[in-house]
Each structure stands twice: as C-alpha cells, then as structure tokens.
Amino acid sequence: MYKTGILNSDISKVLSDLGHTDQIVIADCGLPVPKDVKKIDLALTLGQPSFLEVYEVLKQHMEIEHVTIAEEMEVDNAPIFEQVTKDFSEIEQVNHETFKALTKNAKAIIRTGEATPYANIILQSGVIF
C-alpha cells in the first residue's frame, strides 16, 4: 500500500502510462464523457471532491506541457480561471463545444464533484528529461 501520493489506483495507472503529448481531462460533474474514453469517477456529492482539489494533486504528479480550457471559463468561472492562469503562462482557450470534441482524444477523464460552470481542463503530458 502506498504511504504517500495518489492512492486512487485508476489515476495512478493512467499517469504512469502517459507518454509525451498524451492528454487527460479533469472535469466537473456535468461534462459528457465520450463512449471510448476511460472515465474515472471521483464524484461523491455536489462539490466533492472539487475541481481544484483534484487539479492541485495532479499538478504535483504530472509533467504538464500544455493546457486547454473553454474560453467561457474566464467569465463564467473566474475563481478557477484565475488559479489556472496563475499556474500556466500559456493556455489554449477554445469554445466549449470545441473543448468537448477535443476530449475524445484523452486517455481518461477524471470526473469530480465540481458543480460550477466550465470547470474542465485538458492537461497534455510533457517529458521529464
């Protein structure tokens, strides 16, 4: 049994399997999951766990070279937008419909209990060397 780090075996496995440019998504509880994409459902109740709780943990354990968000997040979810833009200087913003289409390329979508609009992000894996 792990003493530290990510205890969720599905998330741990997905992260360890990521190669350069592979993508995972952290999603609010409302984002549709394409049928051929692995869904890791962490949602317990509305708001738990939050997007930011999951995001902060993944940031610590993943080499991230690129992020994509829905442009609507800037206006409709300023608190999460501010945190993400504080962490990454370059962020690709696309409309929400395009964002949803891009999720079909993800290795996995991690569904949180987040219940605020547009609390979704695509994280693209970098390399550690």
Swiss-Prot record:
E.C. numbers: 5.4.99.62
Quaternary data: Homodecamer.
Keywords of the record: Carbohydrate metabolism, Cytoplasm, Isomerase
PANTHER family given in the database record: D-RIBOSE PYRANASE (PTHR37831:SF1)
Active site residues of this protein: 20
Record family assignment: Belongs to the RbsD / FucU family. RbsD subfamily.
Key word Cytoplasm present: yes
Enzyme class: isomerase
Its job: Catalyzes the interconversion of beta-pyran and beta-furan forms of D-ribose.
Amino acids binding substrate: 28, 96, 118-120
Highest rank taxon of the organism: Bacteria
Gene Ontology MF terms in the entry: D-ribose pyranase activity; intramolecular lyase activity; monosaccharide binding
Main localization category: cytoplasm
Pfam families recorded: RbsD_FucU
Name of the protein in question: D-ribose pyranase
Organism of provenance: Staphylococcus haemolyticus (strain JCSC1435)
InterPro entries: D-ribose_pyranase, RbsD-like_sf, RbsD_FucU
Annotated catalysed reactions: beta-D-ribopyranose = beta-D-ribofuranose
Compartment list: Cytoplasm
Pathway in which this enzyme or protein is active: Carbohydrate metabolism; D-ribose degradation; D-ribose 5-phosphate from beta-D-ribopyranose: step 1/2
Gene name per UniProt: rbsD
Any single GO BP term: D-ribose catabolic process
GO annotations of cellular component type: cytosol
